[in-house]
Amino acid sequence: MVLMDSVVIGGGAWGTAIANLLAFNTQRVTIFCRNTTVIDSINKRHINTKYLPTFPLNKNISATSRMDVLKNAELIFVAVPSQSMRELLQKVKENIKESVQIILCNKGIERESLLLMSEVVHEELPKNDIFVLSGPNFAHEVLSKKPSFSNLAGRNKTSYDKIANALSTETFFTKYITDINGTQILGAFKNVIAIICGLLVRMDAGSNTLSALMSLALEEARSFITIKNGNPDTIMEFCGIGDLVLTCFSNKSRNFRYGYRLVDGYSENALVEGKSTLESLHELARIHNINCVLTNTLYTVTQFNSYGTSSFEQDIKRELNSAFMSLLGCAKNP
């Protein structure tokens, strides 16, 4: 066991799963969050009753809402919604040492600035080493000790080794890559494609259509990676095709479920990362004058006046059909 203190910011399912991994390898693990129910249940019962009520946690995990817990941390993992990232950092940054590695476990793009999460962190904590953890992982499977794989993207191999030693177990594996930007844009983009997959499954589009969508999505992903100066080869990593498949073909994915229920008038204000990410990616494509057909089509669908009405499904079908024809460069059969 490594003699170091680790802090996970965020007491949701993924943050809790990460804390439990760290607890196998590090001396003390603290979850920093605001929810008193989560804090009390972890400290008193060693369980997160709000998000993961059936999974007992390692007993060297504690939880607190006190910011000063960050002062002694050697590793800080951040697992909070992307749109609250900057506000959080501004509140806690005075408690974070410059020598601490920051590991981002969230996926998204800041809506106002169109910055990736690592870019937001760099603005607020310019001296800290930043890593991104991303891969095809559901929290409950990680906690169930099912073999799981992630990329850990960063630009300092020595720091990677330190983080990997703290995080890796017999069933959780990390692979080092240096493409921080590509890793993040793929993590954001796959949420948009998952919404489209949910729509298509709800409309009984079939396996042929869904498989073709994956090919088209990978091409569109290249465009966004280029915008953010990433490496297109990252598409073939766990954080790329691996995460895309997991998120797009499982009804456990919140974004897939959102797309599935969207046809029936599910609230467009639903708290899914794909919703805000969609708006950000649409704006990025517009600014850089790149025709990202899938992203733009889904954005158009969410703006329909027919939203929640009986004609909404037909409007969706028309837009998706038009998008596929456009991507294939062919005209609709008479």
From Swiss-Prot:
GO cellular component, one term: cytosol
Documented EC number(s): 1.1.1.94
Gene from which this protein is expressed: gpsA
The entry's keywords: Cytoplasm, Lipid biosynthesis, Lipid metabolism, NAD, NADP, Nucleotide-binding, Oxidoreductase, Phospholipid biosynthesis, Phospholipid metabolism
Annotated organism of origin: Neorickettsia sennetsu (strain ATCC VR-367 / Miyayama)
Protein name: Glycerol-3-phosphate dehydrogenase [NAD(P)+]
InterPro entries the record matches: 6-PGluconate_DH-like_C_sf (IPR008927), 6PGD_dom2 (IPR013328), G3P_DH_NAD-dep (IPR006168), G3P_DH_NAD-dep_C (IPR006109), G3P_DH_NAD-dep_N (IPR011128), NAD(P)-bd_dom_sf (IPR036291)
GO BP annotations listed: carbohydrate metabolic process; glycerol-3-phosphate biosynthetic process; glycerol-3-phosphate catabolic process; glycerophospholipid metabolic process; phospholipid biosynthetic process
Keyword NADP: yes
Main location: cytoplasm
Taxon lineage: Bacteria, Pseudomonadati, Pseudomonadota, Alphaproteobacteria, Rickettsiales
Cited Gene3D superfamilies: N-(1-d-carboxylethyl)-l-norvaline Dehydrogenase, domain 2 (1.10.1040.10), NAD(P)-binding Rossmann-like Domain (3.40.50.720)
Catalytic residues of the enzyme: K190
Family annotation (SUPFAM superfamilies): 6-phosphogluconate dehydrogenase C-terminal domain-like, NAD(P)-binding Rossmann-fold domains
Reactions listed under catalytic activity: sn-glycerol 3-phosphate + NAD(+) = dihydroxyacetone phosphate + NADH + H(+); sn-glycerol 3-phosphate + NADP(+) = dihydroxyacetone phosphate + NADPH + H(+)
Binding sites annotated in the UniProt record for sn-glycerol 3-phosphate: K107, G135, K190, D243, S253, R254, N255
Family according to the record: Belongs to the NAD-dependent glycerol-3-phosphate dehydrogenase family.
Superkingdom per UniProt: Bacteria
General function of this protein: Catalyzes the reduction of the glycolytic intermediate dihydroxyacetone phosphate (DHAP) to sn-glycerol 3-phosphate (G3P), the key precursor for phospholipid synthesis.
Molecular-function annotations in GO: glycerol-3-phosphate dehydrogenase [NAD(P)+] activity; NAD binding
